[in-house]
C-alpha cells in the first residue's frame, strides 16, 4: 500500500514541499533563512492575534490599551515584546535572505525573485503600520512624516494623502484603517509566500557554486529539516534573549510618550530596519527626488537580473565582485547609522556620499567589474 503522505491529495502537497523535495547536497547555512522567515511570520501572526484581542484602535484609548496589555494581561508584556522584537528578527532574516540572493545569484530565477520583492514591500508596509498602532509620539509623527511623502506626487499628491489619512491630519480614522490593514496584510503575505515557494519549486534551489545541481540532489527530510532546526533554535534563543533582557533596546524612548499633535519630537526617525532607506530619502534636498530615491532603493533589486553581466552565476569564485559586495554591505550599515543621526554637518555629507555609493555600486561598478572578471578568465 502506498504511504498516505504520498497518496492523500493534501498530504502529497506537503510531502512534495517539505519531505521528499529534492535539494542540492551542498547548500550552506545561508539557505536557512527561508525557513526562519516562515517561523518569524508564524510568530508574528500568533502574537499579533492575541494582542489584537486586547488592543483598541481608537486615539483616546490606543496608548492606554497597550499599557493595559503590558501591565494587566497575563503574559501580555511577553506577547507585546515578542511581537515588537519579532519584527526586528524578521527584518534581520529578510536582509540576510536578500543578501544571500545577491551574493549567490539567486535573482536569476526572476519569478521567485520578483515575488520576493513584492513580499519585501508588503512586510515593510505591515511593519510601518504596526509602528503607528501604540499611538506614542514616534508612532504619530512617523505616520505623519511618511504618509506626507506621498504629497510629493504631482497633481494627485495632496488628495491622495488626505484620502489615506481620512481627514486633514493623522487622526482616529487613520489609526483605525492602519489597524485593519496591519491585521490583513500578514495573511496576504502568507499567500505570497506560497506563490514564492511555488515558483522556487518549479526551478529547484540554487546552491553556493551557482552550477546546476540536478545530478546531485538529496531529500529535504531528514537532512535539511535537521539543519533548519538548528537555525530555528539559534534565532529563538536570540529573540528570547532580546525580549527577556533588553526588550526596549531597538525601540525609541519617545514612543512611551502618548501622541501629541502639538509637540514635535526633536528627531523623528523610523524603526532601525528602515533607517538605510530613510537616510537615502533625507540625502536628496528635493521632496519628489527623495521619495523616488527611497522607492528605488528597494525597487533597484528588480533590476538585478538585467544587471548581471558575469558568465558565472555565483560570486563564490569572483574575488573582485566579492569586494564590491562587502563594500555594499558596509555602505548599507553606514546608511543605517546616518539615518538615526540628526540632520547636521558632517552627517548630511556622509549620507549623501553613502547614497551615491549605494546606487553607483549596484548600477555601475558591479556590472563593470563582472565584465572585467569575464576577460580575466580568458588569461
UniProtKB/Swiss-Prot annotation:
Function: Component of the ubiquinol-cytochrome c reductase complex (complex III or cytochrome b-c1 complex) that is part of the mitochondrial respiratory chain. The b-c1 complex mediates electron transfer from ubiquinol to cytochrome c. Contributes to the generation of a proton gradient across the mitochondrial membrane that is then used for ATP synthesis.
Keywords in alphabetical order: Electron transport, Heme, Iron, Membrane, Metal-binding, Mitochondrion, Mitochondrion inner membrane, Respiratory chain, Transmembrane, Transmembrane helix, Transport, Ubiquinone
CC cofactor note: Binds 2 heme b groups non-covalently.
Gene Ontology CC, one term: mitochondrial inner membrane
Domain of life assignment: Eukaryota
Keyword Metal-binding: yes
Names of required cofactors: heme b
GO MF term set: metal ion binding; ubiquinol-cytochrome-c reductase activity
Residue ranges of the TM segments: 33-53, 77-98, 113-133, 178-198, 226-246, 288-308, 320-340, 347-367
Record note on quaternary structure: The cytochrome bc1 complex contains 11 subunits: 3 respiratory subunits (MT-CYB, CYC1 and UQCRFS1), 2 core proteins (UQCRC1 and UQCRC2) and 6 low-molecular weight proteins (UQCRH/QCR6, UQCRB/QCR7, UQCRQ/QCR8, UQCR10/QCR9, UQCR11/QCR10 and a cleavage product of UQCRFS1). This cytochrome bc1 complex then forms a dimer.
Binding site for heme b b562: 83, 182
Family as reported in the entry's similarity comment: Belongs to the cytochrome b family.
Keyword Lipid biosynthesis belongs to the record: no
InterPro entries, sorted: Cyt_b/b6_C (IPR005798), Cyt_b/b6_C_sf (IPR036150), Cyt_b/b6_N (IPR005797), Cytb/b6-like_sf (IPR027387), Cytochrome_b (IPR030689), Cytochrome_b_C_euk/bac (IPR048260), Cytochrome_b_N_euk/bac (IPR048259), Di-haem_cyt_TM (IPR016174)
UniProt protein name: Cytochrome b
Additional notes on this entry: Heme 1 (or BL or b562) is low-potential and absorbs at about 562 nm, and heme 2 (or BH or b566) is high-potential and absorbs at about 566 nm.
Membrane topology: Multi-pass membrane protein
Subcellular location: Mitochondrion inner membrane
Residues at which a ubiquinone binds: 201
Amino acids binding heme b b566: 97, 196
